[in-house]
Amino acid sequence: MIKAGIVGGTGYTGVELLRLLAKHPQVEVSVITSRAEAGVKVADLFPNLRGHVDLAFTEPDVNILGQCDVVFFATPHGVAQNMMPVLMKTGTRIVDLSADFRIRDVPLWEKWYGQTHGAPDLVSQAVYGLPEVNRDAIRSAKLVACPGCYPTATQLGFLPLIENNLVDPSRLIANAASGASGAGRQAKIDNLLMEISDSFKAYGVKGHRHLPEIEQGLRDVQPAGVAAAQLTFVPHLLPIIRGIHATLYATLLDVNQVPDLQSLYQQRYANEPFVDVLPAGEMPQTRSVKGSNVCRISVFRPQARDTVVVLSVIDNLTKGASGQAIQNMNIMFGFDETAGLDVVALLP
Protein backbone atom coordinates (compact mmCIF):
# COMPACT_ATOMS: atom_id res chain seq x y z
CA MET A 1 0.00 0.00 0.00
CA ILE A 2 1.33 3.42 -0.96
CA LYS A 3 0.30 6.87 0.19
CA ALA A 4 -0.89 9.40 -2.37
CA GLY A 5 -1.42 13.13 -2.23
CA ILE A 6 -3.51 15.29 -4.54
CA VAL A 7 -2.75 18.96 -5.08
CA GLY A 8 -5.76 20.80 -6.45
CA GLY A 9 -8.57 18.54 -5.41
CA THR A 10 -11.61 20.68 -6.19
CA GLY A 11 -11.46 20.65 -9.99
CA TYR A 12 -13.00 17.99 -12.19
CA THR A 13 -9.73 16.09 -12.62
CA GLY A 14 -9.16 16.21 -8.87
CA VAL A 15 -12.53 14.72 -8.00
CA GLU A 16 -12.08 12.14 -10.77
CA LEU A 17 -8.79 11.11 -9.15
CA LEU A 18 -10.59 10.72 -5.83
CA ARG A 19 -13.39 8.67 -7.39
CA LEU A 20 -10.98 6.21 -8.97
CA LEU A 21 -8.42 6.05 -6.15
CA ALA A 22 -11.16 5.42 -3.57
CA LYS A 23 -11.40 1.86 -4.91
CA HIS A 24 -7.72 1.31 -5.74
CA PRO A 25 -6.46 -1.79 -3.89
CA GLN A 26 -2.91 -0.46 -3.46
CA VAL A 27 -3.38 3.24 -2.71
CA GLU A 28 -4.44 5.31 0.28
CA VAL A 29 -5.08 9.00 -0.38
CA SER A 30 -3.60 10.65 2.70
CA VAL A 31 -3.78 14.33 1.77
CA ILE A 32 -5.76 16.48 -0.63
CA THR A 33 -5.17 20.20 -0.92
CA SER A 34 -7.19 23.27 -1.79
CA ARG A 35 -6.43 26.78 -0.65
CA ALA A 36 -10.00 27.93 -1.23
CA GLU A 37 -11.65 24.97 0.55
CA ALA A 38 -9.13 24.30 3.34
CA GLY A 39 -10.93 22.75 6.31
CA VAL A 40 -13.94 21.61 4.29
CA LYS A 41 -14.63 17.88 4.24
CA VAL A 42 -14.29 16.37 0.78
CA ALA A 43 -17.64 14.58 1.05
CA ASP A 44 -19.38 17.86 1.88
CA LEU A 45 -18.21 19.35 -1.41
CA PHE A 46 -18.58 16.16 -3.46
CA PRO A 47 -21.47 14.08 -2.05
CA ASN A 48 -20.77 11.22 -4.45
CA LEU A 49 -17.71 10.47 -2.29
CA ARG A 50 -19.66 10.12 0.98
CA GLY A 51 -18.65 6.85 2.61
CA HIS A 52 -15.61 6.54 0.37
CA VAL A 53 -13.34 9.49 1.21
CA ASP A 54 -12.99 10.64 4.83
CA LEU A 55 -10.63 13.57 4.35
CA ALA A 56 -10.78 17.34 4.59
CA PHE A 57 -9.03 19.72 2.24
CA THR A 58 -5.84 21.30 3.57
CA GLU A 59 -3.49 24.07 2.50
CA PRO A 60 -0.64 22.83 0.28
CA ASP A 61 2.38 21.98 2.45
CA VAL A 62 5.49 20.58 0.79
CA ASN A 63 6.61 18.95 4.05
CA ILE A 64 3.37 16.97 4.30
CA LEU A 65 3.22 16.18 0.58
CA GLY A 66 6.83 15.01 0.76
CA GLN A 67 5.74 12.18 3.07
CA CYS A 68 3.63 10.69 0.27
CA ASP A 69 4.95 8.06 -2.11
CA VAL A 70 3.28 9.80 -5.04
CA VAL A 71 1.70 13.22 -5.52
CA PHE A 72 -0.75 14.09 -8.27
CA PHE A 73 -0.96 17.69 -9.44
CA ALA A 74 -4.48 18.45 -10.69
CA THR A 75 -3.81 22.17 -10.85
CA PRO A 76 -4.03 24.91 -13.47
CA HIS A 77 -1.04 25.33 -15.72
CA GLY A 78 1.82 27.18 -14.04
CA VAL A 79 1.16 25.95 -10.49
CA ALA A 80 3.00 22.62 -10.36
CA GLN A 81 6.26 24.03 -11.70
CA ASN A 82 6.57 26.40 -8.75
CA MET A 83 6.35 23.60 -6.16
CA MET A 84 8.22 20.97 -8.12
CA PRO A 85 11.89 21.83 -7.37
CA VAL A 86 11.40 21.53 -3.60
CA LEU A 87 8.99 18.58 -3.70
CA MET A 88 11.20 16.47 -5.94
CA LYS A 89 14.06 16.77 -3.46
CA THR A 90 11.96 14.84 -0.94
CA GLY A 91 12.02 11.75 -3.15
CA THR A 92 8.28 11.79 -3.74
CA ARG A 93 7.34 10.66 -7.23
CA ILE A 94 5.06 12.99 -9.15
CA VAL A 95 2.34 12.70 -11.78
CA ASP A 96 1.50 16.13 -13.16
CA LEU A 97 -1.85 16.43 -14.93
CA SER A 98 -1.17 20.00 -16.02
CA ALA A 99 0.78 20.96 -19.14
CA ASP A 100 3.79 22.30 -17.23
CA PHE A 101 6.21 19.54 -18.22
CA ARG A 102 4.69 18.06 -21.39
CA ILE A 103 6.56 20.14 -23.97
CA ARG A 104 10.34 19.70 -23.97
CA ASP A 105 11.03 22.95 -25.82
CA VAL A 106 10.74 25.48 -22.99
CA PRO A 107 10.57 28.62 -25.20
CA LEU A 108 7.84 26.92 -27.24
CA TRP A 109 5.91 26.14 -24.05
CA GLU A 110 6.28 29.75 -22.91
CA LYS A 111 5.00 30.99 -26.26
CA TRP A 112 1.84 28.87 -26.19
CA TYR A 113 1.07 29.22 -22.48
CA GLY A 114 1.95 32.90 -22.20
CA GLN A 115 4.14 32.73 -19.11
CA THR A 116 7.73 32.18 -18.05
CA HIS A 117 8.43 28.62 -16.98
CA GLY A 118 9.22 28.39 -13.27
CA ALA A 119 11.31 25.21 -13.39
CA PRO A 120 12.93 24.91 -16.82
CA ASP A 121 15.76 22.74 -15.51
CA LEU A 122 13.28 19.99 -14.61
CA VAL A 123 11.59 19.78 -18.00
CA SER A 124 14.22 17.40 -19.38
CA GLN A 125 13.67 15.06 -16.41
CA ALA A 126 9.96 14.62 -17.10
CA VAL A 127 8.71 11.53 -18.93
CA TYR A 128 5.72 12.06 -21.21
CA GLY A 129 3.07 9.78 -19.77
CA LEU A 130 1.47 8.12 -22.78
CA PRO A 131 1.81 4.47 -21.69
CA GLU A 132 1.18 3.07 -25.15
CA VAL A 133 4.45 4.71 -26.25
CA ASN A 134 6.59 5.35 -23.17
CA ARG A 135 5.78 2.49 -20.82
CA ASP A 136 9.41 1.51 -20.18
CA ALA A 137 10.51 5.07 -19.39
CA ILE A 138 7.49 5.61 -17.13
CA ARG A 139 8.51 2.67 -14.90
CA SER A 140 11.56 4.47 -13.56
CA ALA A 141 10.31 8.05 -13.85
CA LYS A 142 10.41 10.45 -10.92
CA LEU A 143 8.22 12.99 -12.75
CA VAL A 144 5.55 12.03 -15.28
CA ALA A 145 3.86 14.66 -17.43
CA CYS A 146 0.38 13.29 -18.05
CA PRO A 147 -0.82 14.01 -21.62
CA GLY A 148 -3.70 16.33 -22.37
CA CYS A 149 -7.11 15.07 -23.42
CA TYR A 150 -7.01 16.08 -27.09
CA PRO A 151 -3.38 14.89 -27.42
CA THR A 152 -4.30 11.47 -26.02
CA ALA A 153 -7.18 10.84 -28.42
CA THR A 154 -5.29 12.25 -31.39
CA GLN A 155 -1.98 10.50 -30.86
CA LEU A 156 -3.53 7.10 -30.19
CA GLY A 157 -5.55 7.48 -33.38
CA PHE A 158 -2.60 8.42 -35.57
CA LEU A 159 0.16 6.25 -34.03
CA PRO A 160 0.02 3.14 -36.25
CA LEU A 161 0.02 5.24 -39.42
CA ILE A 162 2.88 7.48 -38.28
CA GLU A 163 5.04 4.71 -36.81
CA ASN A 164 4.89 2.80 -40.10
CA ASN A 165 5.38 5.90 -42.31
CA LEU A 166 2.25 5.16 -44.30
CA VAL A 167 0.92 8.71 -44.60
CA ASP A 168 2.12 12.15 -45.62
CA PRO A 169 3.32 13.75 -42.36
CA SER A 170 2.64 17.24 -43.69
CA ARG A 171 -1.06 16.61 -44.34
CA LEU A 172 -2.45 15.48 -41.01
CA ILE A 173 -5.82 16.86 -39.88
CA ALA A 174 -7.62 16.46 -36.56
CA ASN A 175 -11.16 17.67 -35.98
CA ALA A 176 -11.79 16.94 -32.32
CA ALA A 177 -14.79 17.74 -30.15
CA SER A 178 -14.85 17.82 -26.34
CA GLY A 179 -17.50 17.99 -23.66
CA ALA A 180 -17.72 21.13 -21.54
CA SER A 181 -15.83 19.63 -18.59
CA GLY A 182 -12.68 19.93 -20.69
CA ALA A 183 -12.71 23.65 -19.93
CA GLY A 184 -12.41 23.00 -16.20
CA ARG A 185 -14.56 23.73 -13.16
CA GLN A 186 -14.80 27.48 -13.29
CA ALA A 187 -17.40 30.11 -14.04
CA LYS A 188 -17.35 31.03 -17.73
CA ILE A 189 -20.26 32.47 -19.67
CA ASP A 190 -19.34 30.43 -22.75
CA ASN A 191 -19.75 27.21 -20.75
CA LEU A 192 -23.15 27.92 -19.21
CA LEU A 193 -25.90 25.42 -20.01
CA MET A 194 -27.91 28.02 -21.92
CA GLU A 195 -24.85 28.89 -24.01
CA ILE A 196 -23.77 25.40 -25.07
CA SER A 197 -27.08 23.51 -25.11
CA ASP A 198 -28.48 22.75 -28.59
CA SER A 199 -25.34 24.16 -30.19
CA PHE A 200 -21.99 23.07 -31.61
CA LYS A 201 -19.03 25.26 -32.39
CA ALA A 202 -15.33 25.30 -33.18
CA TYR A 203 -12.82 27.31 -31.18
CA GLY A 204 -9.08 27.89 -31.13
CA VAL A 205 -8.87 27.58 -34.91
CA LYS A 206 -5.98 30.06 -35.12
CA GLY A 207 -4.02 27.94 -32.70
CA HIS A 208 -4.69 25.73 -29.68
CA ARG A 209 -2.02 25.05 -27.06
CA HIS A 210 -2.43 21.29 -27.42
CA LEU A 211 -1.08 21.52 -30.97
CA PRO A 212 2.66 21.59 -30.11
CA GLU A 213 2.15 18.73 -27.65
CA ILE A 214 0.49 16.57 -30.29
CA GLU A 215 3.10 17.37 -32.93
CA GLN A 216 5.92 16.59 -30.49
CA GLY A 217 4.36 13.22 -29.70
CA LEU A 218 3.85 12.30 -33.34
CA ARG A 219 7.39 13.34 -34.25
CA ASP A 220 8.78 11.18 -31.46
CA VAL A 221 7.44 8.01 -33.10
CA GLN A 222 8.34 8.83 -36.71
CA PRO A 223 11.04 6.73 -38.39
CA ALA A 224 14.42 8.41 -38.78
CA GLY A 225 14.82 10.65 -41.81
CA VAL A 226 11.13 11.40 -42.25
CA ALA A 227 9.92 15.00 -42.53
CA ALA A 228 8.54 16.29 -39.24
CA ALA A 229 4.82 15.75 -38.69
CA GLN A 230 2.63 18.81 -39.14
CA LEU A 231 -0.96 18.88 -37.94
CA THR A 232 -3.97 21.05 -38.67
CA PHE A 233 -5.91 20.87 -35.42
CA VAL A 234 -9.43 22.25 -34.97
CA PRO A 235 -11.09 21.70 -31.57
CA HIS A 236 -14.85 21.93 -31.05
CA LEU A 237 -17.17 22.23 -28.06
CA LEU A 238 -19.85 19.57 -27.66
CA PRO A 239 -23.03 20.19 -25.64
CA ILE A 240 -22.23 17.23 -23.34
CA ILE A 241 -20.50 17.02 -19.97
CA ARG A 242 -17.65 14.62 -20.70
CA GLY A 243 -16.16 12.88 -23.71
CA ILE A 244 -13.95 13.55 -26.73
CA HIS A 245 -14.57 12.45 -30.31
CA ALA A 246 -11.63 12.95 -32.66
CA THR A 247 -12.02 12.56 -36.42
CA LEU A 248 -8.55 12.25 -37.94
CA TYR A 249 -7.54 12.48 -41.59
CA ALA A 250 -4.30 11.40 -43.25
CA THR A 251 -3.18 11.01 -46.87
CA LEU A 252 -1.52 7.75 -47.91
CA LEU A 253 1.96 8.04 -49.41
CA ASP A 254 1.46 5.08 -51.77
CA VAL A 255 -2.03 3.80 -52.52
CA ASN A 256 -0.54 0.72 -54.20
CA GLN A 257 1.25 -0.47 -51.08
CA VAL A 258 -1.21 -0.22 -48.23
CA PRO A 259 -1.40 -2.92 -45.57
CA ASP A 260 -4.73 -4.03 -44.18
CA LEU A 261 -5.41 -1.08 -41.91
CA GLN A 262 -7.79 -2.96 -39.65
CA SER A 263 -5.13 -5.59 -38.98
CA LEU A 264 -2.47 -2.90 -38.53
CA TYR A 265 -4.45 -1.24 -35.75
CA GLN A 266 -5.49 -4.49 -34.11
CA GLN A 267 -1.90 -5.72 -34.00
CA ARG A 268 -0.53 -2.40 -32.71
CA TYR A 269 -2.94 -2.31 -29.79
CA ALA A 270 -3.41 -6.04 -29.17
CA ASN A 271 -1.64 -5.92 -25.81
CA GLU A 272 -2.86 -2.50 -24.69
CA PRO A 273 -5.41 -2.88 -21.88
CA PHE A 274 -7.04 0.48 -22.51
CA VAL A 275 -7.18 0.74 -26.29
CA ASP A 276 -10.07 -1.00 -28.02
CA VAL A 277 -9.95 -1.27 -31.81
CA LEU A 278 -13.54 -1.81 -32.90
CA PRO A 279 -14.52 -4.37 -35.54
CA ALA A 280 -14.32 -3.13 -39.13
CA GLY A 281 -17.12 -0.74 -39.99
CA GLU A 282 -18.18 0.07 -36.43
CA MET A 283 -18.24 3.68 -35.22
CA PRO A 284 -17.12 4.59 -31.69
CA GLN A 285 -19.41 6.68 -29.50
CA THR A 286 -18.44 8.95 -26.62
CA ARG A 287 -21.04 7.34 -24.38
CA SER A 288 -19.29 3.98 -24.79
CA VAL A 289 -16.30 5.27 -22.80
CA LYS A 290 -18.01 7.57 -20.27
CA GLY A 291 -16.32 7.17 -16.89
CA SER A 292 -13.84 4.58 -18.20
CA ASN A 293 -10.13 4.67 -19.02
CA VAL A 294 -10.67 3.24 -22.50
CA CYS A 295 -9.90 4.72 -25.91
CA ARG A 296 -12.02 3.19 -28.67
CA ILE A 297 -10.78 3.47 -32.23
CA SER A 298 -12.08 2.75 -35.73
CA VAL A 299 -10.13 3.06 -38.98
CA PHE A 300 -11.52 3.56 -42.48
CA ARG A 301 -10.31 4.10 -46.04
CA PRO A 302 -13.35 5.60 -47.78
CA GLN A 303 -13.84 4.49 -51.39
CA ALA A 304 -10.39 2.84 -51.20
CA ARG A 305 -8.84 6.19 -52.11
CA ASP A 306 -5.81 7.93 -50.65
CA THR A 307 -7.42 9.25 -47.46
CA VAL A 308 -7.45 7.35 -44.18
CA VAL A 309 -10.07 8.35 -41.62
CA VAL A 310 -9.57 7.38 -37.98
CA LEU A 311 -12.23 7.85 -35.30
CA SER A 312 -11.02 7.98 -31.70
CA VAL A 313 -13.10 8.49 -28.55
CA ILE A 314 -12.13 8.87 -24.90
CA ASP A 315 -13.56 10.30 -21.70
CA ASN A 316 -11.62 13.54 -21.35
CA LEU A 317 -11.61 13.27 -17.54
CA THR A 318 -10.52 9.62 -17.39
CA LYS A 319 -8.25 8.38 -20.18
CA GLY A 320 -7.78 12.06 -21.04
CA ALA A 321 -6.65 13.00 -17.52
CA SER A 322 -7.15 11.27 -14.16
CA GLY A 323 -7.50 7.67 -15.33
CA GLN A 324 -4.36 7.94 -17.41
CA ALA A 325 -2.58 9.53 -14.43
CA ILE A 326 -3.46 6.48 -12.33
CA GLN A 327 -2.42 4.18 -15.18
CA ASN A 328 0.96 5.92 -15.10
CA MET A 329 1.16 5.56 -11.32
CA ASN A 330 0.42 1.84 -11.61
CA ILE A 331 3.31 1.46 -14.04
CA MET A 332 5.66 3.54 -11.86
CA PHE A 333 5.05 1.40 -8.78
CA GLY A 334 4.88 -1.99 -10.47
CA PHE A 335 1.17 -2.53 -9.86
CA ASP A 336 -1.14 -4.24 -12.30
CA GLU A 337 -1.65 -1.56 -14.94
CA THR A 338 -5.42 -1.92 -14.72
CA ALA A 339 -5.59 -1.66 -10.91
CA GLY A 340 -8.35 0.72 -9.88
CA LEU A 341 -9.26 1.29 -13.52
CA ASP A 342 -11.29 -1.78 -14.40
CA VAL A 343 -14.42 0.34 -14.65
CA VAL A 344 -17.29 -0.31 -17.04
CA ALA A 345 -18.45 2.77 -18.95
CA LEU A 346 -21.72 4.35 -17.85
CA LEU A 347 -24.80 3.80 -20.01
CA PRO A 348 -27.10 5.52 -20.69
From Swiss-Prot:
InterPro entries reported in the protein's UniProt record: AGPR_AS, AGPR_type-1, NAD(P)-bd_dom_sf, NAGSA_dehydrogenase, Semialdehyde_DH_NAD-bd
Major place of residence: cytoplasm
Pfam families: Semialdhyde_dh, Semialdhyde_dhC_1
Active site: 149
Gene Ontology annotations of biological process type: L-arginine biosynthetic process
Source organism, top-level taxon: Bacteria
Membrane-crossing residue ranges in chain numbering: none
Catalytic activity: N-acetyl-L-glutamate 5-semialdehyde + phosphate + NADP(+) = N-acetyl-L-glutamyl 5-phosphate + NADPH + H(+)
CDD domains xrefs: AGPR_1_C, AGPR_1_N
SMART domains: Semialdhyde_dh
Cell compartments where the protein resides: Cytoplasm
GO molecular function: N-acetyl-gamma-glutamyl-phosphate reductase activity; NAD binding; NADP+ binding
Gene3D superfamilies recorded: Dihydrodipicolinate Reductase, domain 2, NAD(P)-binding Rossmann-like Domain
Record has Cytoplasm as a keyword: yes
Keywords: Amino-acid biosynthesis, Arginine biosynthesis, Cytoplasm, NADP, Oxidoreductase
Pathway(s) per entry: Amino-acid biosynthesis; L-arginine biosynthesis; N(2)-acetyl-L-ornithine from L-glutamate: step 3/4
EC number: 1.2.1.38
Physiological role: Catalyzes the NADPH-dependent reduction of N-acetyl-5-glutamyl phosphate to yield N-acetyl-L-glutamate 5-semialdehyde.
HAMAP family: ArgC_type1
Family classification: Belongs to the NAGSA dehydrogenase family. Type 1 subfamily.
Protein name in the entry: N-acetyl-gamma-glutamyl-phosphate reductase
Organism: Cellvibrio japonicus (strain Ueda107) (Pseudomonas fluorescens subsp. cellulosa)
Lineage: Bacteria, Pseudomonadati, Pseudomonadota, Gammaproteobacteria, Cellvibrionales
